[in-house]
């Protein structure tokens, strides 16, 4: 009996395959106590798959992309998928080189880049930040650049560049630092002068005059850039080289009125002796400043934009590796007057002013931002996620809930600066302020009534009898769009206004207000004849007829006498 059970178990194990056998091998010791023989799994049974990667390991970013983008359909089975994921993760995080803190920093950095808005993600990823601090610096610089477009009328690429000190440059992989230098030399068709290259490698500060002499013996370079271009700058990533190839436009470097601009000097700050003005002990302060110790390694004009031999700069410029920044300012001009030095930023600005790429599939209305489209779609779906805790009323937008809550709190945050009257909503304040601006009032030619320009066309409909808003259900017409919306609730049966006391619901807010007076006992309408008060205006009108009838009766009796 036992032998037959053992044979059956062995047969089922053979059907399950070596994967299950390997998992059971972990429990080999308990199995021996139970009298079961351990089964050794041959390595060949796991398959002969090996990672199909080249001998030279790819860079961590490539491995990360392969790790995130791997699909189960691309591999032969679960074993291969798991093995490949482990290998890609190891090549990405490099546990044999990085500490636990560094690995955690990489994971946090990846998640930080993931949650960034799409328009920022591309910029930050192009700079390949090595830490979260570098990524934050890029985001802040880009935000400052975008915020400053209206005041400065110019966006410069340095606002979006990652600052690399000599220490950070040394921490870069040799392949990456060499690639940055080789890319710069390849794009410019030039090489570093030997005298300067050795001193740059040794982190020595080169006198300004020597830089100018090495780069331009005739001294025309200083004349061409007097007061216009920076001499010391940040070492930017190779993103600029790629952008120049794509757009053909140089990216000007200019960083002003920002923390990164400390120690950022231009040729206009260079005196005749070739030193920086404001430095007490020649270059001692520069040596102590990590920000100022970064000489520009690569900033070049695209080949199409370089001056010819006959131009002022001369042919020597093409063969020299400049330690100064040279850029031709060719801003993109927008209709609003803002200038942009990069086509991507110009495209973003153009979308904000013109394009509405997000379109509603129900009504065809377009929006500039995706969030506005989501907010609009709640009109069609009827979703009202924001509810008032006082009365239970729900709203589709948080701003509408905020306005509604002021009816409970009595808050009136909007104040008229001329008369001091306060209002709950900004629209009410704007309507009130029109009473102070008499110049915007117009007189109706039909009846002589004076009204604001915003209400003039609405008032003229009273005389013309125009009713442009028509109900498709019953073909009833209305003068105002709001009246049509209120009327629609009769057909849909919608009653959005509910009483917080008794739960009764109404299709109009005015009806709810009248109903609530039953619970509060409020009687706002007062008869001027006898002082009696009423909850509704219709009740007051009915009551006033009593006094009118008494007057008429008294008049008839006097005439008879």
Swiss-Prot record:
PANTHER family: KRUEPPEL-LIKE TRANSCRIPTION FACTOR, ZINC FINGER PROTEIN 384. GO terms for molecular function: DNA-binding transcription factor activity, RNA polymerase II-specific; RNA polymerase II cis-regulatory region sequence-specific DNA binding; zinc ion binding. GO terms for cellular component: nucleus. There is a cross-link at residues 40, 203, 228, 254, 282, 443 (Glycyl lysine isopeptide (Lys-Gly) (interchain with G-Cter in SUMO2)). Keywords: DNA-binding, Isopeptide bond, Metal-binding, Nucleus, Phosphoprotein, Repeat, Transcription, Transcription regulation, Ubl conjugation, Zinc, Zinc-finger. Residues 43-62, 238-283 are annotated as: Disordered. Residues 64-146 form the SCAN box domain. A zinc finger (C2H2-type) spans 358-380, 386-408, 414-436, 442-463, 469-491, 497-519, 525-547. The modification Phosphoserine is found at residue 12. May be involved in transcriptional regulation. This is Zinc finger protein 394. PROSITE patterns: KRAB (PS50805), SCAN_BOX (PS50804), ZINC_FINGER_C2H2_1 (PS00028), ZINC_FINGER_C2H2_2 (PS50157). The gene is ZNF394. InterPro entries: KRAB (IPR001909), KRAB_dom_sf (IPR036051), SCAN_dom (IPR003309), SCAN_sf (IPR038269), Znf_C2H2_sf (IPR036236), Znf_C2H2_type (IPR013087).
């Amino acid at each position: 009996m036992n032998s037959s059970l053992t044979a059956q178990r062995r047969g089922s194990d053979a059907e399950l395959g070596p994967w299950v056998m390997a998992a059971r091998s972990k429990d080999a010791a308990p199995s021996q106590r139970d009298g079961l023989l351990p089964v050794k799994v041959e390595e060949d049974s796991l398959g002969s798959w090996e990672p199909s990667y080249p001998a030279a390991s790819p860079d961590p970013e490539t491995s990360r992309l392969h790790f995130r983008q791997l699909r189960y359909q691309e591999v032969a089975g679960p074993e291969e998928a798991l093995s490949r994921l482990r290998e890609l993760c190891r090549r990405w995080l490099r546990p044999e080189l990085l500490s636990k803190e560094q690995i955690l920093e990489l994971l946090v950095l990846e998640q930080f880049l993931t949650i960034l808005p799409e328009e920022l993600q591309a910029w930050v990823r192009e700079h390949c930040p090595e830490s979260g601090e570098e990524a934050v610096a890029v985001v802040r610089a880009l935000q400052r650049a975008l915020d400053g477009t209206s005041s400065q009328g110019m966006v410069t690429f340095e606002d979006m560049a990652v600052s690399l000190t000599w220490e950070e440059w040394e921490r870069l992989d040799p392949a990456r630092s060499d690639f940055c230098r080789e890319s710069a030399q390849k794009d410019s068709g030039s090489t570093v002068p030997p005298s300067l290259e050795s001193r740059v490698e040794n982190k020595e500060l080169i006198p300004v005059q020597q830089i100018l002499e090495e780069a331009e013996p005739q001294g025309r370079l200083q004349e061409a850039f007097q007061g216009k271009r920076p001499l010391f700058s940040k070492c930017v990533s190779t993103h600029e080289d790629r952008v120049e190839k794509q757009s053909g436009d140089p990216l000007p470097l200019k960083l002003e009125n920002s923390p990164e601009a400390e120690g950022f000097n231009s040729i206009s700050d260079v005196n005749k002796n070739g030193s920086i003005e404001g430095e007490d002990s020649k270059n001692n302060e520069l040596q102590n400043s990590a920000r100022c110790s970064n000489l520009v390694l690569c900033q070049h004009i695209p080949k199409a934009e370089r001056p010819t031999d006959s131009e002022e700069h001369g042919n020597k410029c093409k063969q020299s590796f400049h330690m100064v920044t040279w850029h031709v300012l060719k801003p993109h001009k927008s209709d609003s007057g803002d200038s942009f030095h990069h086509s991507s930023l110009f495209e973003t600005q153009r979308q904000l002013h013109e394009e509405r790429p997000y379109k509603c599939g129900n009504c065809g209305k377009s929006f500039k931002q995706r969030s506005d489209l989501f907010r609009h779609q709640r009109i069609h779906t009827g979703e009202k996620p924001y509810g008032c805790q006082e009365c239970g009323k729900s709203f589709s937008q948080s701003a509408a809930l905020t306005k509604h809550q002021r009816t409970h709190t009595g808050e009136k945050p909007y104040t008229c600066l001329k008369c001091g009257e306060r209002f709950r909503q900004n629209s009410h304040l704007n309507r009130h302020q029109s009473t102070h601006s008499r110049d915007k009032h117009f007189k109706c030619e039909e009846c002589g009534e004076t009204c604001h320009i915003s209400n003039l066309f609405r008032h003229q409909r009273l005389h013309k009898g125009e009713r442009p808003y028509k109900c498709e259900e019953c073909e009833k017409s209305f003068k105002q769009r709001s009246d049509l919306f209120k009327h629609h609730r009769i057909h849909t049966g919608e009653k959005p206004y509910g009483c917080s006391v008794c739960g009764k619901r109404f299709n109009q807010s005015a009806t709810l207000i009248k109903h609530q007076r039953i619970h509060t006992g409020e009687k706002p309408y007062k008869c001027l004849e006898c002082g009696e008060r009423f909850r509704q205006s219709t009740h007051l009108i009915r009551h006033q007829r009593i006094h009118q009838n008494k007057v008429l009766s008294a008049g008839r009796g006097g005439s008879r006498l």
